[in-house]
Amino acid sequence: MSLVKLYDTTLRDGTQAEDISFLVEDKIRIAHKLDEIGIHYIEGGWPGSNPKDVAFFKDIKKEKLSQAKIAAFGSTRRAKVTPDKDHNLKTLIQAEPDVCTIFGKTWDFHVHEALRISLEENLELIFDSLEYLKANVPEVFYDAEHFFDGYKANPDYAIKTLKAAQDAKADCIVLCDTNGGTMPFELVEIIREVRKHITAPLGIHTHNDSECAVANSLHAVSEGIVQVQGTINGFGERCGNANLCSIIPALKLKMKRECIGDDQLRKLRDLSRFVYELANLSPNKHQAYVGNSAFAHKGGVHVSAIQRHPETYEHLRPELVGNMTRVLVSDLSGRSNILAKAEEFNIKMDSKDPVTLEILENIKEMENRGYQFEGAEASFELLMKRALGTHRKFFSVIGFRVIDEKRHEDQKPLSEATIMVKVGGKIEHTAAEGNGPVNALDNALRKALEKFYPRLKEVKLLDYKVRVLPAGQGTASSIRVLIESGDKESRWGTVGVSENIVDASYQALLDSVEYKLHKSEEIEGSKK
């Protein structure tokens, strides 16, 4: 099958999303990752529109990319200004990109109301701008803004705008669903009509306002489109752009279209999480293909089936996109879940062992009280080890006390925790302050234990979530605390439940520390 070229606009269109902004250094790092995975075109921004994009195009020239081409984005010339005098077009050329992509008006409504020029003059803007760029830049793409809405309003004029781009020898004409409202059945019909009039290579750029961006992109490829534009994780204005993390595996694995290599596809999940990290956003665990839950199984019947034949409940092998099968533990679990988790944790367990059923019943009883182990697998691993008698007790907490004090109305509250622990035959009694009672307790616990276990200095509390459970009444409701901790090697989650938020936090903190000590001991043991 013919090659479908991938055009990424995360660094420009993706940054128009609410709460997303990248430093120049971030954009350079993302560009390298996009290049590694095999993206053909990387749109870096709009030169001249802001200092950040100016700096990007200056700095990216110093970088060595293996195959990706850098694209600069802009608009057609202004009315009543010749291309060689137009600041926007001159700035595009001065940025020295591999590709220039400019957008122009397709919808007669926009021509009249936004540009306030005649329809004929708009055609001249499109032709003149593209012709000028073609004489100065290796490749030129034309984004037909609002094409599908424009076609529905005035099909003859919409086609004329594409013909103007074709006459100017644009290397690819990109049909844009800018408002994101076009349905797949409409898109297919319109592209078929376009192909009766336009012979130039066509691309597709869709937005997700109707939850159809990925579907529309794939339908477009089926209709002969050769370039697909989108963003990593679907970042973009309003509801986002077409998600390349869904489009790429669908093209390659479902539609058998050439786009990137097998080894590159296996880096897809890593790329997704890398971009989330630089955007300072938590990954969407329910995201197709690359999310943590994309291949997660909770029901016991499902788990039993996938252990024999993964395809029973997985539409493809997760390893193909760099993901993995996960077995969740909950009150829906069966023995298969427990055994699968034991195997994951390298814990030997027999399916006929009564302890398996005991663990299962314990989980159901604990979840009835409000515990949840999907995000707290470290707590679950410790639960299994305790049931099997393989849990080593590194220390015991004799008691603790937490004091919150506010001395003056205009001052911050003071939090102090006092704790007494026993390690072997030695007792350690210490105190620590913190930013709130939980932080104070965390500091005191680790302060008491670090002299015995120095490796605890590596641990940091990364995330802390509190949820009031609905079963209780008013202030007497139970509270579930989920804590994520980590060191330089890994991250792990623990859980605690109580009517008292400090006690629930204490349970989760205790599991976090114990898990770290168990893992450190296992690593040290494997080195001997």
Swiss-Prot record:
* Keywords on record: Amino-acid biosynthesis, Branched-chain amino acid biosynthesis, Isoleucine biosynthesis, Transferase
Describe what happens without this gene: Cells lacking this gene show a great reduction in citramalate synthase activity and are capable of growth in the absence of isoleucine, whereas mutants lacking both cimA and the threonine ammonia-lyase tcdB are auxotrophs for isoleucine.
Q: In which pathway does it act?
A: Amino-acid biosynthesis; L-isoleucine biosynthesis; 2-oxobutanoate from pyruvate: step 1/3
> InterPro entries this protein is in?
2-isopropylmalate_synth_dimer, AIPM/Hcit_synth_CS, Aldolase_TIM, Citramal_synthase, LeuA/HCS_post-cat, LeuA_allosteric_dom_sf, PYR_CT
SMART domains in alphabetical order: LeuA_dimer
Q: Which GO terms describe its molecular function?
A: (R)-citramalate synthase activity; 2-isopropylmalate synthase activity
Which PROSITE patterns does the entry link to? Answer: AIPM_HOMOCIT_SYNTH_1, PYR_CT
Enzyme Commission (EC) number:
2.3.3.21
Which residues are in the Pyruvate carboxyltransferase domain? 4-266
Question: Which CDD domains does the protein's record reference?
Answer: DRE_TIM_LeuA3 (cd07941)
Superkingdom to which the source organism belongs: Bacteria
What is the uppermost EC class here? Answer: transferase
The record's section on Gene3D superfamilies has: 1.10.238.260, 3.30.160.270, Aldolase class I
This protein's record includes keyword Transferase = yes
Question: What does the record give as the reaction this protein catalyses?
Answer: pyruvate + acetyl-CoA + H2O = (3R)-citramalate + CoA + H(+)
- UniProt entry tagged with the keyword Cell membrane: no
One example of a Gene Ontology biological process annotation: L-leucine biosynthetic process
Give the similarity note: Belongs to the alpha-IPM synthase/homocitrate synthase family.
Q: What does this protein do?
A: Catalyzes the condensation of pyruvate and acetyl-coenzyme A to form (R)-citramalate. Makes part of the main pathway for isoleucine biosynthesis in G.sulfurreducens, i.e. the citramalate-dependent pathway.
Classification via PANTHER family: (R)-CITRAMALATE SYNTHASE, ALPHA-IPM SYNTHASE/HOMOCITRATE SYNTHASE
Q: What is this protein called?
A: (R)-citramalate synthase
